[in-house]
């Protein structure tokens, strides 16, 4: 267990009055008050990151900083086994991790999960604990994909990888032990974008040919619009940590260099006028998040 996890564990057991004193004056935005435990962690992380900005770091360094999430994440669920694999998708051979409940069957539901990171940073293991939780609680086989990132790979490479994973899972459902009729899409932040767009594209494709549709979509603080002009949560949460408006500007600059493709429909599923006949959706937003209003 990491030092950060030990601190979190101690904070959970400490009297609330003591925790609030350590946290300092409460952070309040738009009627939301930040949890004292989270405020302590956020303040600590922000102080460590303060000397550096995204303008002075390389993408590799920024991506490495994202690995700090591992330090505060709980341990992976014990009721879940993992397998690290490489999948020969139509777009590329990509790394993936498969989470399987220990009491798995040959016809379990499936979840395809896509990680956060603005389509620019992080990787398929960033949400390791959460993926194990989903697999455990849903009694499903979950596959998280190390999709291709910008700017090395031009947008919409990540979405094309997601669609290729969908096809691969349906073509190999029996070997994977997944019921192809019960496959959901899920993702956080940019991963929510991938899941949302895939649902819309698969819905549209079904008007031309009979194909399976996602059973559900789980969108966790999804990034579903490239519009980051001031206003609403983009303004009130502009200087939050770890996601700020400056970070969003950095993501846009790397995904859409010189603004090329920034209005692409696949980058803006929020503005799709046709939201009919889509899978049931669960949308979770974060109170202190510039893209909160997009959810």
How would you label these PLM feature ranges?
Residues 1-98:
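A glycine/proline-hinged amphipathic helix-loop "lid/cap" segment
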Residues 2-14, 76, 83-294:
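Alpha/beta-hydrolase superfamily serine-hydrolase fold, recognizing
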């Amino acid at each position: 267990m990491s030092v950060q996890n030990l601190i979190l564990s101690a904070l959970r057991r400490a009297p609330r009055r003591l925790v609030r004193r350590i946290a300092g004056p409460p952070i309040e935005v738009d009627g939301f008050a930040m949890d004292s435990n989270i405020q302590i962690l956020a303040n600590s992380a922000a102080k460590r990151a303060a000397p550096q900005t995204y303008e002075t770091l390389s993408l590799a360094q920024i991506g490495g900083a994202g690995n700090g999430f591992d330090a505060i994440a709980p341990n992976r669920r014990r009721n879940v086994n993992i397998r690290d694999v490489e999948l020969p998708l139509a777009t590329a051979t990509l790394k993936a991790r498969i989470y399987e409940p220990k009491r798995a069957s040959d016809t379990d539901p499936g979840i395809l999960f896509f990680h956060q990171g603005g389509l620019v940073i992080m990787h398929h293991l960033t949400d390791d604990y959460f993926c194990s939780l989903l697999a455990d609680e849903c009694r499903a086989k979950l596959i998280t994909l190390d999709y291709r990132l910008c700017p090395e790979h031009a947008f919409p490479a990540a979405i094309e990888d997601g669609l290729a994973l969908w096809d691969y899972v349906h073509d190999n459902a029996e070997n994977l032990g997944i019921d192809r009729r019960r496959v959901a899409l899920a993702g956080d932040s940019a991963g929510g974008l991938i899941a949302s767009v895939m649902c819309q594209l698969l819905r549209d494709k079904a008007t031309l040919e009979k194909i399976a549709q996602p059973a559900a979509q789980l969108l966790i603080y999804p990034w579903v619009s490239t519009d980051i002009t001031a206003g609403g949560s983009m303004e009130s949460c502009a200087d939050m940590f770890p996601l700020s408006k400056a970070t969003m500007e950095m993501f846009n600059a790397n995904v859409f260099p010189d603004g090329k493709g920034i209005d692409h429909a696949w980058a803006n599923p929020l503005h799709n006028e046709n939201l009919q006949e889509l899978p049931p959706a669960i949308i979770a937003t974060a109170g202190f998040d510039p893209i909160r209003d997009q959810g």
